[in-house]
Amino acid sequence: MQPMRRLDLSAVERALREVQGRFAELSQHFTEPRDPFTDEVLLNVVEGYALIDDYVARGIDLFDLQQLNLMLEINATVLCGRDPARRVEFAAHLAATEAHFFNNVEGGIKDLHNWYCAYRSDSIWKRAAGVYVRILSKPQLFIEGNNRTGSLIVSYLLMRAGLPPFVLSLDNAEGYFNPSSVIR
């Protein structure tokens, strides 16, 4: 059996730091303003990549009914990181996000799960694009952090299919941020 390829988190961080270093310049070409790409945001996203890498390595299926809550963990990680003190600080927001995630009848996880199950046998590209659009479309799946969480869930799907993850880079930043604005 071939050993599972793991993410090079240092390479992911390098790519993100390149974007961060030129974010002000890049954002001049975005169709709508974006929040600053701070060190905290960057490090939380890297922790998110470590998390999805672990899920893939352990063979976890995020779209199994028993595992859907792990998408909330990805979202919490991009917002707060893995630090327990930050999780306590944001406990009310995380609880509100969980309620929104499970109880939103117009979008929510039920809609995403049903869509994914209906298209499970389609190409990975169609599934990844459909999942991303459903996460970002109104009503968005999470209260905050939908772009970052969505790109990590897409990366997870790509990695499970043996493909490289999506990583924000200088080459794809404009293409990533502008369609994300239109989807919402």
Language model regions located:
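FIC/Doc superfamily catalytic core
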Residues: 1-184
